[in-house]
From Swiss-Prot:
Residues 69-74, 155 are mitochondrial intermembrane. The modification Phosphoserine is found at S13, S17. It comes from Mus musculus (Mouse). One of its GO terms (biological process) is response to hypoxia. There is a cross-link at K119 (Glycyl lysine isopeptide (Lys-Gly) (interchain with G-Cter in ubiquitin)). Integral mitochondrial outer-membrane protein that mediates the formation of mitochondria-associated endoplasmic reticulum membranes (MAMs). In turn, mediates angiogenesis and neoangiogenesis through interference with intracellular Ca(2+) communication and regulation of the vascular endothelial growth factor receptor KDR/VEGFR2 expression at both mRNA and protein levels. Also acts as an activator of hypoxia-induced mitophagy, an important mechanism for mitochondrial quality and homeostasis, by interacting with and recruiting LC3 protein family to mitochondria. This is FUN14 domain-containing protein 1. Its main location: mitochondrion. Keywords: Autophagy, Isopeptide bond, Membrane, Mitochondrion, Mitochondrion outer membrane, Phosphoprotein, Transmembrane, Transmembrane helix, Ubl conjugation. A motif (YXXL) lies at residues 18-21. InterPro entries: FUN14.
Length: 155
């Protein structure tokens, strides 16, 4: 159960005080919580029918795919246009590019990325394992999301 915090003067620091809430008690007192989040906190399989899961996954996947497509087009246009303008300016003599320095900087960046990737490998493996577990537990909504995402990219 949640208990109220003592008055602020009992703390060493008067800056902030926090209250710990017990969500199970909160859900019992607020019935809308149960309507929105359901009675169980398990996988989606326990809460909704297969058709509902497929529709939910498909709609969210389509939205994500559509946005990914639009943002991707915009980013590709900006990068491609910038590169094209840089090439025209270089060819016209407005800009001088030191390609040896560019190559040196790119190689330095590659080495730094490899170092950081090797350090981050355990955390990435953790995230991948959690994502895999989620997908296995919610295979229907996950497959709906993937299908919707691909449809969103295509539209």
């Amino acid at each position: 159960m949640a208990s109220r915090n003592p008055p602020p003067q009992d703390y060493e620091s008067d800056d902030e005080s926090y209250e710990v809430l017990d969500l199970t008690e909160y859900a019992r007192r607020h019935h809308w919580w149960n309507r929105v989040f359901g009675h169980s906190s398990g996988p989606m399989v326990e809460k909704y029918s297969v058709a509902t899961q497929i529709v939910m996954g498909g709609v969210t996947g389509w939205c994500a795919g559509f946005l990914f497509q639009k943002v991707g087009k915009l980013a590709a246009t900006a990068v491609g246009g910038g590169f094209l303008l840089l090439q025209v300016a270089s060819h016209s003599g407005y800009v001088q590019i030191d390609w040896k320095r560019v190559e040196k900087d790119v190689n330095k960046a590659k080495r730094q990325i490899k170092k950081r990737a090797n350090k981050a490998a355990p955390e990435i493996n953790n995230i991948i394992e959690e994502a895999t577990d989620f997908i296995k537990q919610n295979i229907v909504i996950s497959s709906g999301f993937v299908g919707g995402f691909l449809l969103g990219l295509a539209s």
